[in-house]
Curated annotation (Swiss-Prot):
Reaction catalysed by this enzyme: 3'-dephospho-CoA + ATP = 2'-(5''-triphospho-alpha-D-ribosyl)-3'-dephospho-CoA + adenine
Pfam families per record: CitG
Any GO molecular function: triphosphoribosyl-dephospho-CoA synthase activity
Keywords linked to the UniProt accession: ATP-binding, Nucleotide-binding, Transferase
Family designation: Belongs to the CitG/MdcB family.
EC number: 2.4.2.52
Any single GO BP term: prosthetic group biosynthetic process
PANTHER family: 2-(5''-TRIPHOSPHORIBOSYL)-3'-DEPHOSPHOCOENZYME-A SYNTHASE, TRIPHOSPHORIBOSYL-DEPHOSPHO-COA SYNTHASE
Name of the molecule in the record: Probable 2-(5''-triphosphoribosyl)-3'-dephosphocoenzyme-A synthase
Gene3D superfamilies according to UniProt: Triphosphoribosyl-dephospho-CoA protein
Amino acid sequence: MTKAVLTSISQLALKALLYEVSLSPKPGLVDRFDNGAHDDMSFITFIDSMIALSPFFQAYIETGFAYAKEEPLLLFNRLRQLGQKAEETMFCATQGINTHKGLNFSMALLLGATGAYLARTPHLMTDLGRFSKEDTLAICRLVKPMTAHLIQTDLGHLNTKKEFTYGEQLFVTYGIKGPRGEASEGFTTLTDHALPYFRQMISQNDPETSQLRLLVYLMSIVEDGNLIHRGGIEAWKGVKADMRLLLQQDLSTTDLRLALSSYNQCLINQHLSPGGAADLLALTFYFAFLEKLL
C-alpha cells in the first residue's frame, strides 16, 4: 500500500515534466511545435530525459519517506547522491545534452520532502485525496533546513577555483543563486507567487489557458539564470518587461497563443530561452496535481 501511494505521487512529478514540455507555444523553449532557441535538443530529447529520470523520482520520495526522522542535512546528502546518479543517467540518455539538470535537483528535494511529509501525516497515505495549500507550504518548508548550508558550501569558496560550472559562473558574475537559492529559501517563488497565481487562474479559465498565463507570469517575475547566461542582465530585464505588458493586455486565449508564437520567434532570433521559468512551471504543475487543481 505504502509503495503504491509513493509510486503514484512520483508519477505526478513525471506528469508535471510531460505537461511542461507539451505546453505550446512557449517562447524560446522546446515544445510540441518547435525547439525554441535550442539547436541541440528537441521534444524527443526531453522525452528520453524524462524516461531516464522517472525511476529516480520514485527513489527520491521513497528516500524521504524512509528517512523522515533523520537530520535534514543527512537526508539532503542521501537525496543529492541519488540526484547525481540521476543526472549521469540523464546525460547518458540525451548524449550529453542538459535537459533537466536544475529541475532534477529541485525535484529530488521536493519529492524527498513530500515523502518525509507523508511519513509525518499518515492520514494522507490512507486517503489520498486533495492535498491542501497548507500541505504544499509545509512540504516546501521542509526543504529549507535541508539546504540552509547550500549557498555557503557550494558557492562560498569559488575564489579558489579556476574553472566554473554554468551555475557557479552565474553566481560569480551576477550573484544569481539559481535552483540552490530557490531551495535554500524554501521555494518561495512557488509558494508565494506561482501557486497563488495559478490557483486564481484555474478558477477562472480552462486548464490550457491557465497554464499559458502562468508561463507568462513566471517569465515576468523569475530571476532566470538561463536568460541571463544567454543574453545578460538587460536581455532578461527586457523579457520580463515584455511579459508584464502581455499580462496587462488580458488577451483572449486565441490572441494569447498568437502573441506567444510571435514572441517565440523574437527569442529564437536572440538565442534566448527562459529555462528558469520553465523549471518553475513544471514544479508548479507538480503541486497543482497534488492539490487536484489539474
